[in-house]
Amino acid sequence: HLMSGSLIELAARPADRERLYDQPDAIPGAVEELLRWVTPIQQFARTVTADTEVGAVPVAEGDYLVMLYASGNRDEAAFGPTAGELDLTRAPTTPNLAFGFGEHFCLGAALARMEARILFEELARRRMTFTQAGAATYLPSSLVRGPHEVPFTFS
């Protein structure tokens, strides 16, 4: 869903896409920004294993907590005053939450980053232009946000 979501964003921003093509060294940073922005895994729930507090709110053992990764990836305290905007030149100073964190960090993170990087490097090498050729349909899920189908026209 990272790649299809990223293609949707780049199709809507042809000037950003061209800048990326002109500066292929910026692709790894752009992948991080697109991960932050697209956030395919929107949230995850956990069961609290011991009484604790989260942000001064008491949480009891056995309670469920839902971590909203997409919301965390828009946090102005972490990503600055423009956290609500896609900026392919944003310096990745704060790790995004697209792959989770801690012991539950996604084992496929390096592979997904590599796949996206190679996709954008190849698009840049070939100077591929593309447009979205119709509306995307999305998976009916609160956990995963990703297109089920999205038509593109490449040239």
Tell what function each PLM region has.
Residues 1-155:
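Cytochrome P450
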